[in-house]
Amino acid sequence: MWSLPPSRALSCAPLLLLFSFQFLVTYAWRFQEEEEWNDQKQIAVYLPPTLEFAVYTFNKQSKDWYAYKLVPVLASWKEQGYDKMTFSMNLQLGRTMCGKFEDDIDNCPFQESPELNNTCTCFFTIGIEPWRTRFDLWNKTCSGGHS
């Protein structure tokens, strides 16, 4: 059986500690990288229908006769720490020339009247259960326009 002399064994202890620490850091880094990749994949798949739900809900709750549609997504992110998959987003919505109950709102032009405020900015938090095709509006806060 092979063994190190006691003085050599003590000099190897810091080296072993360093290697085990490096292994833990590498594992944690790879785990975080994989988790971020999974988040990005979920965002790519589930954010578009969540945006559609947000705009649909805005139009449904709005007292305005005209439909609004998405101008740009100002910011969006996947929330952590909820039971359901949850997205928060800041959206800018523009007022269209179509009524909100018309069929083809996506192809409807925006109103461009300078005397009217035709855009509003809204913050939404929406929980989703994609396996059940269920969306729950948890927060909607809007400013400007006819919100």
Curated annotation (Swiss-Prot):
Range of residues in the leader sequence: 1-28
Cellular location(s): Secreted
Domain of life from the UniProt record: Eukaryota
Disulfide-linked positions: 98-108, 122-142
Keywords: Disulfide bond, Glycoprotein, Protease inhibitor, Secreted, Signal, Thiol protease inhibitor
An annotated Gene Ontology molecular function: cysteine-type endopeptidase inhibitor activity
Known glycosylation sites: 117, 139
Keyword Signal applies: yes
GO annotation (BP), single: antimicrobial humoral response
Chief subcellular location: secreted
Gene Ontology cellular-component annotations: extracellular space
Family: Belongs to the cystatin family.
Protein name: Putative cystatin-9-like protein CST9LP1
Species in which this protein is naturally found: Homo sapiens (Human)
